[in-house]
Design a protein with these regions (language model features):
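Bacterial N-terminal signal peptides
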Residues: 8-18
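Sec/Tat signal peptide C-region and signal peptidase I cleavage site
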Residues: 20-24
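Gly/Pro-enriched, hydrophobic low-complexity segments
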Residues: 25, 30-58, 75, 83, ...
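Solvent-exposed N-terminal domain segments of exported/luminal and surface proteins
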Residues: 30, 34-250, 256
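Flexible, processing/modification-adjacent segments and terminal tails
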Residues: 109-188, 193, 246-248, 256-341, ...
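Short acidic/polar alpha-helix capping motifs at helix-coil junctions
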Residues: 214-216, 325, 355
Length: 453
């Protein structure tokens, strides 16, 4: 049994489950969705002192032409206070170990805390599918924590009974049915110098469609991803194709332009390094966590209030990348932190399994189920890699989205900034739903043709 205090409600919530249990939520629990809980399972009420407000539906869906600058509805907000090395101890109960480490060890690192704006909502179709899943969705009982049963187009476990279910909500976070994005991955050195790997990426998420009545309806596919490097010249034409599944391990292929050869990647998951990423990111770190859950025991610790990146309009606004990343962290004036409730999940490597990160801690936003912070530890229990993601509402989608994230490797004193879109063409978040992505792109036989264009 897990017991934790439901913050803001003033009542104790108990979740009962046995080891390996796969049961969905009860009808009584599911009935809370849309009432005291939001339609995706967050606490609707604010907290006791009002620093976290009541959820009122998030920003409404709106019209936006591709290429139009995003309008920041909270641009007039001013920081309430800042957290830095001089006062970090005062706020440590609302910070992760990784955040505290960055504040204490990176000179000038600070977190500007703004008023909390619960801006994230979803289309009605997502709410409806989430409600169905509340009493339907189940994980496998074979110890692998695969998704055994659910409908698509919604969150599977709005009322999670264990840590694995909470992480599956992150894996299936709703960001539309497919997108085309252009970005740069920046590899940053201790002296602040960096080089960028420019990439074009096509993503389809078949299980994000409300038409998917089961994993079998989409041939077990969660996501298909095609990534093409476009700069620097030494990397141009490299292609990675990956298929992420709901019930089995990932498949991946890579095209090498110099050899005009397609090679199947034997292991594109777990702690295997992403090719060309200078050993700074593992396959299951992208984005924040992805892939199979079977090497860890997952503990749902409970909820806590935490300062996390939120409503990151200023950070993702168009500007030269060199103006965003200064020294060993993104420019502080561009970052916005807010107080939100997060689910804390601890992952510990199972006995008999191996992974370079023997322990991981994830902090999952209650309103979006997105992992916003993650700490990774080595075999000696020492903090190794610290990760942070940002999010903002995409009004054309009617949902919050997350692209940019950073990962600091504390052992080599470097960090990487993933999915930096500030200097790139705009992301087409509606490309999948509106038919602007050719499904043939995601076939391994097409890789050489795409690379030879």
């Amino acid at each position: 049994m897990i017991q934790f205090r439901a913050l803001g409600l003033g009542v104790v919530v108990s979740t009962f489950f046995a080891a390996g249990a796969v049961n969905a939520a009860t009808e009584a629990d599911a009935a809370k969705l849309g009432k005291e809980l939001t339609p995706v399972g967050a606490e609707k009420a604010g907290n006791k002192d009002g620093s976290i407000p009541e959820w009122k539906g998030g920003l409404p869906k709106g019209q936006r032409k591709l290429g139009d600058a995003r309008v920041d509805p909270f641009a007039a907000d001013k920081p309430l206070f800042s957290i830095d090395a001089s006062n970090v101890e005062k706020y440590k109960d609302k910070l992760s170990a990784g955040q505290i480490e960055l504040i204490k060890t990176r000179k000038g690192y600070r977190m500007d805390v703004y008023p909390t704006q619960r801006s994230c909502g979803y289309p009605d179709s997502v709410y409806g599918q989430t409600k169905i899943n509340a009493t339907l969705a189940k994980l496998s009982n074979d110890g692998k924590d695969n998704l055994a049963q659910a409908v698509g187009g919604g969150f599977p476990f709005a009322i999670p009974g264990n840590g694995a279910e909470a992480v599956w909500n992150h894996r299936l976070r709703w960001q539309g049915e497919g997108r085309v994005e252009f970005y740069q991955t920046n590899f940053i050195n201790p002296d602040g110098s960096f080089y960028g790997l420019a990439q074009d990426q096509w993503i389809m998420t078949p299980f994000a469609s409300p038409k998917a009545k089961s994993p079998e309806d989409v041939a077990d596919v969660q996501m298909k991803l095609l990534n093409v490097a476009t700069a620097p010249a030494s990397r141009t034409g490299e292609i990675i194709l990956a298929h992420y599944f709901l019930k089995k391990s990932n498949d991946a292929w890579m095209y090498f332009p110099g050899q005009r050869r397609v090679r199947r990647l034997p292991a594109f998951e777990y702690d295997n390094p992403i090719p060309g990423y200078e050993n700074l990111e593992t396959a299951d770190q992208y984005p924040m966590f992805a892939g199979s859950l079977d090497r860890y025991d997952w503990k749902l610790v409970g909820k806590q209030e935490m300062y996390v990146p939120y409503n990151s309009f200023k950070f993702v606004a168009k500007r030269p990348v060199k103006e965003v990343y200064e020294g060993m962290y993104p420019k502080r004036d561009l970052m916005r932190y807010e107080l939100h409730r997060v689910w804390k999940v601890e992952a510990t490597v199972k006995q008999g399994m191996r992974h370079m990160f023997t322990k991981r801690t994830f902090y999952i936003d209650e309103d979006t189920w997105m992992i916003l912070n993650a700490d990774q530890y080595d075999a000696q229990g020492k903090l190794w890699r610290v990760m942070e993601a940002s999010l903002y509402p995409a009004v054309e989608l009617g949902a919050c989205v997350s692209q940019e994230f950073q990962s600091w490797d504390l052992t080599v004193n470097r960090y990487m900034a993933e999915n930096s879109t500030q200097e790139a063409k705009p992301t087409d978040w509606l490309a999948g739903a509106e038919g602007r992505i050719d499904p043939k792109r995601f076939e391994s036989d097409e890789l050489r043709r795409v690379g030879d264009r």
